[in-house]
């Protein structure tokens, strides 16, 4: 299985060359740790360095906002869009019904023959759907009918798991190499807020604020199916050129 480089040198070294082709990787971290920027880097470098078309899907930022953010690092996303190497898509979770965004993502990927897809973020997508919408999205016509007579109870956890399973299944069907982001719980052993993503994806990278310095972020490749990876802690820094990843100093406590 070949490797797909993210394009961030230090992170690709930690991944021993990149992500195994066709894998879906979870980037999980608290707010402000760099999840979105790593995802955008994956898409931008894929298009600009490796000529691999990509689709970036955001629940929090519009295409215009993403283009403006990219300019801070000297990245011209519009030029890549004109060359059919990039598609940006915003999901308005307050307006979406029946998870139709999955069809849109698939259509955009086919339109440019995408090799890379990023969804930012799973957390938002799992927090704005009703139980009945999940049933409908899964094709549960019997439950849909029963639900009009007797409500079908579904806990928030069940809803989240249904959404995640559906999304990851669709991503796998695209044959693209994918990154998905999630909020990382502040405490506990879970690696995502939905508590199920980490078991369904092929790999997990966590981003945590360094406990002794607010400006520093710890990066750790927790798992990578179908390939070896560094087990060492790494540090993230944001420069005017984007994300930099370097090995942490020996002896640093996580």
Task: Show which residues each predicted segment covers.
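Conserved P-loop
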Residues: 30-95
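Pre-Walker A adenine-sensing motif
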Residues: 6-18
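NTP-binding/hydrolysis catalytic cores, primarily Walker-type P-loop NTPases
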Residues: 1-8, 112-113, 139, 232-254
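Phosphate-binding/switch loop-helix module in NTP-utilizing enzymes
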Residues: 91-172
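Short hydrophobic/aromatic beta-strand immediately N-terminal to the Walker A/P-loop
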Residues: 25-28
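Loop/turn-to-beta-strand initiation segments
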Residues: 53, 85, 113-116, 174-181
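Phosphate-binding/switch region of NTP-binding enzymes
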Residues: 172, 176-241
